[in-house]
Structure formats: C-alpha cells, structure tokens
Amino acid sequence: MTRVYVGNLDPRVTERELEDEFKAFGVLRNVWVARRPPGYAFLEFDDERDALDAISALDRKNGWRVELSHKDKGGRGGGGGRRGGIEDSKCYECGELGHFARECRRGRGSVRRRSPSPRRRRSPDYGYARRSISPRGRRSPPRRRSVTPPRRGRSYSRSPPYRGSRRDSPRRRDSPYGRRSPYANGV
C-alpha cells in the first residue's frame, strides 16, 4: 500500500469528493480527511504506480499539493525529540526538512502565528456567524411585535393606483368620484 498526502484542501471537502477524484487512477484502500485542523487528507492506494500517476496528474490542480506521504519511510518513531522524527519530517508548504507546515515561515505568503486559544476565536463552521445564546443557556425571548397593525391601503408612491384598462372603466376622468357635481358647467 502507498500513502498519498493531499494538502491545501478547502475545509468543506468531503471524503467522497476526494475518492471520486482519485479513484480514476486505481484502487483506493482508505481516504481520511482532517477536520481539526482542516485542509489536508491522506489516501491509500493499493499499487504504488497508481499513486504516482495520481500525484503527477493532480498535484497543483485546484491549488492542491499532492505528494507521497513520508510516513511510509520509517513511521513516526525512531527520530526522538518531542514530536518523534521532526528532523526527518518534510514541510508540505516549502519542502524543507526539520519543521511542519503549520510552523513554516514561508508558506502561504506570511508568517503564521498561533493564538493562545484558536478554538474560542474560530467558529465551528469556519467563518459563518453563529447565533449567540443567553448566559442561562436559553435563547433570549422573541421580540415583541408592534401594537399598531400594519397600514393597508394606498402606498406612498406618487403614481396613481393601477385600475386596469381605461376602456373597461365606466367612470369619467373629469371627476374623482365618478359622477358629475350638480354645480359643474355652471348649473
């Protein structure tokens, strides 16, 4: 089995979408998409040649970084240190050894600093506002509606209301009430 790393993924990408994209190159044994933090995935191909074909075809497509996973070369242990083999680890952003992509100073155009509490700052739906809940854990009471009923009738438009075709109207145009005043025409 050959493991492939896919980086720079949209946080909303699903395992099914990746499977559909990569299965054209060969038999997939496993697809795993990271959720915390999002943005990368690992796929396992049955045959190394299929994995290499997928890498050559899909690397840099859609902005993705697709390459062989380095976990196949010796696993996690053996390197010592606090992270186990950090000296042998290759950064997926810049390609250099000795640090991870989240610590890369050259990746994505700027230095990325970790805040002390990233979970508090980031909403679970990645940027969309969430509704606040009152301190007691309940939602605040619904807003009261206005006591005055909504106005019905003529709008505030300056144009007269639509009355249909003029041919169908029995009213005369010279009087706003549809009949003549007895005082019109000097009577």
From Swiss-Prot:
UniProt biased composition (Low complexity): 178-187
Subcellular location: Nucleus speckle
Coiled coil: none
Residues annotated as domain RRM: 2-73
Compositional bias (Basic residues): 107-122, 136-155
Modified residues (Phosphoserine): 123, 132, 134, 140, 146, 159, 181
Post-translational modification: Extensively phosphorylated on serine residues in the RS domain. Phosphorylated by AFC2.
Gene Ontology CC: nuclear speck; spliceosomal complex
InterPro entries per UniProt: Nucleotide-bd_a/b_plait_sf (IPR012677), RBD_domain_sf (IPR035979), RRM_dom (IPR000504), SRSF (IPR050907), Znf_CCHC (IPR001878), Znf_CCHC_sf (IPR036875)
Function: Probably involved in intron recognition and spliceosome assembly.
Name of this chain's protein: Serine/arginine-rich splicing factor RSZ21
Species the sequence originates in: Arabidopsis thaliana (Mouse-ear cress)
